[in-house]
Amino acid sequence: AASQVTEVPNTIPHPAQDSALALARSVKQWGTPQYSNGYICRNPRRNDQMHHYDMNLCYIDELLWHLNWTGDLEYARRMWPVLTRHLAWEKLNYDPDNDGLYDAYACIWASDALYYNSGAVTHSTAYNYRANRLAALIAEKIGENSTPYHEEADKILKALNARLWMPERGHWAEFQDFMGHKRLHTAPGVWTIYHALDSDIADPFQAYLATSYVDREIPHIPVRGEGLKDEGYATISTTNWLPYSWSINNVAFAEVMHTALAYFQAGRTDAGFKLLKSSILDGMYLGESPANFGQISFYDAARGECYRDFGDPIGVASRVLIQGLYGILPDAMNERLLVKPGLPSAWLSASLHTPDIDFGFQRGDKEGVTSYVVTHRLPAVRTLELQFPAQRSKVAKLTINGKPATWTLVEKSITRPMLSVVVPASSGEETDVHIEWGGEEFSSPASVPANVAYAEAPVCFVPMQQDEMKWWYPVDRPQPEANQSLIEPSTFTQVHSAKCEPVVMDTRFNSSVTDIFRNEYLSPRSPYTTLQIPKQGIGEWCHPLHTVDINDAGLRSSVQNGILNTELGIPFRTPAEGHNVAFTSLWDNYPDSLEIPLKGKASRAYLLMAGSTNHMQCHIDNGVIRVYYKDGTCDVMFLRNPDNWPPIEHIFFEDGLAFNRHTPTLYRLRLKTGEISNNFGEELGFPGASRELDGGAAVLLEMPLNPGKKLSHLVLETLSNDVVIGLMSITLQR
């Protein structure tokens, strides 16, 4: 709070990008939207030192948790100006179009190399939802106007559900593009899932669904070691994105722990505990510094085990223990303590002692009796709510401190019924809840009826009732990826050289492939301050001046009479001099799309292509090729990173774990030498996950066609922001 800027009004309008750093990030100048009142500087008690991270969101979230635990309204009153300045600053900078969805500017651990180009981002928006919702509560408690904060929180939640929640997929998008086609990026990192749950934007169904996305799509890496019994332990990577860049796809202890917390918050206690235990075994038991919290895991393919005594995992591990496993959730500003234990279903007993709370749990072997004992020492708390899972279909008897008491069912309980008891409980008072169970064990649904919840999602929920208990039972319903066609791998197993005929497309060439990173891509760009791709079309805000020299000398020297004869038996027409690529892009430098006439009939089209992509354009269609026939129909092949669209400067690192393309390795043509291989990664001896190729490489693709139809033309269109997609040659197999 003492590092917050208070005397620097915003006098310089959006956008305020740093021209010396290739427009990738905000210029460090007082008076810009970012470096003005409300901004929290990095160093303690210094509000005159700029830095490049948005530390505001994390600090304010910690402050609000402090108030949740203490209920200290006098301190809340002192901090009120800090909170309101922060919220105004976030709105000015990251929701300048006032749509309720916020850009993210280096505001989480995985900030390095993340950039959203003024997009609508789930994790930062979730942070702002919680901050506004609790600001409204604080305002009510201290006599300030709560209306603006209620309205903003409602607006945010409505926008999140309308635009970023994907019901057919059962999770939020990583972000929605502000520029271009305003598409959703549908493969979020774990930070999207855990921040959403941590900031309370999810209902119980959404919480379960979102964590099941982690089960299905986030890479799981087995945790094994000498002397460790193999019980299915596994840690996770933060994303499934390629190519590698620091903080984009890592195995980081804090990220794993926070995801474990999300499982507990979703009520998936066994899964949460398994992930928590896996991470502890990985770092604190099998690691090189036993009992220590490091930053990066041994299982991280890029960095390996590194850093000691790291604050991020220490803090999050504390939260997953207290708030997740033991479910201690103070709401002290409302004089309330919620205890919602996340204990594994196999545990028969557990206890916890901290300066704030004592907790005890006992369960009989036959699930006939359960008891919970809670004593808190939170001065502001007057009421205790205990939520716990039912063990059988009836409650025969429930007492609190020996006296009969009432209970209620928790609405939207998933997997098993949850019960709630509420009792007055001031600091130091022991509350002993004793339950004797009756009835029967719980059954599973025999079939999936029509009246399920979230029927379109990969998991649906069946309403269940058994005696006194009601709950929802999750049923997996795997579905194909929505709105994404299957991309057939290019294996080149059906090449017939004698039937191959190169297409003459010389008049469509508009550049040389070597120009791709020598250009300046200046428009269109966001009208707001943001993190974005540097003007040379490669790099990111941490490496804004990075570039790669694309060198096609080997390709050109291999051309004979305008033809490149390849080892695959495919001849490609390409010039030895002059322009040799037809680029398309959403940048104004090149057309969004182009058309190339075709003639006759063909069974396949072989394509020599080259262009750019990056981790922010992973698992989304970067472009599309449409081959039209004379009858007006067309065949379509999407160009998707990493399936069949690689960055010109990179060879994908693949390990079958965190870096897994789930498709055969691509054939690449090394531009500097003219060599073709689908194994350059090993042949050239790259030492790690970063495989930047000297001179760059084109990619060879094949597209099956209908041999019975006459061809009309081919259209290449770029769909993604950031990227440039180039067609260098087409060969038809008649």
Q: Where are the predicted features?
A:
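Extended, well-ordered alpha-helical scaffold segments
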Residues: P15-G31, L73-K91, A131, A135-R163, ...
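Short strand-turn-strand beta-turns centered on an Asx-Gly dipeptide
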Residues: D72, T399-P404, K630-D631
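Aromatic-rich carbohydrate-recognition surfaces in CAZymes
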Residues: A1-G100, V121-Y129, T186, V190, ...
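Conserved, compact domain cores that house catalytic/ligand-binding motifs in diverse enzymes
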Residues: A1-A16, E456-E488
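Conserved small-residue packing positions in alpha-helical repeats and bundles
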Residues: L64, A136, Y194-L197, A260
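Non-catalytic C-terminal accessory modules of carbohydrate-active enzymes
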Residues: H258-V462
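N-terminal/edge-of-domain interface segments
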Residues: P480-R734
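Extended glycan-interaction surfaces of carbohydrate-active proteins
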Residues: A1, A20-H51, A88, L92-A120, ...
